[in-house]
């Protein structure tokens, strides 16, 4: 089980990213637009740099919804391999069958 502080920190980052996404997208579009004057693009770069680091999507870590584990997490269902195995052995994951040969 991951530390609660790590899980909460990641959740805060998700919220910040969601709130700041439109503003970041606008600033990035201004920076990428070669038709605008250089001063305006540079000002947009400075505004983007002033935004909080945690509002960037790269700072988000994929974590298991059940355990908070950060490694070996499947994006499709947001569960770690260990959680999938436990739920599968209890029969709670539809279509998951223990292999035998």
Curated annotation (Swiss-Prot):
Pfam families from the UniProt entry: Ribosomal_S14
Xref: InterPro entries: Ribosomal_uS14, Ribosomal_uS14_bac/plastid
Keywords annotated in UniProt: Ribonucleoprotein, Ribosomal protein, RNA-binding, rRNA-binding
Signal peptide positions on this chain: none
Bias (Basic residues): 11-23
TM stretches of this protein: none
HAMAP family: Ribosomal_uS14_1
Free-text function comment from the UniProt entry: Binds 16S rRNA, required for the assembly of 30S particles and may also be responsible for determining the conformation of the 16S rRNA at the A site.
UniProt protein name: Small ribosomal subunit protein uS14
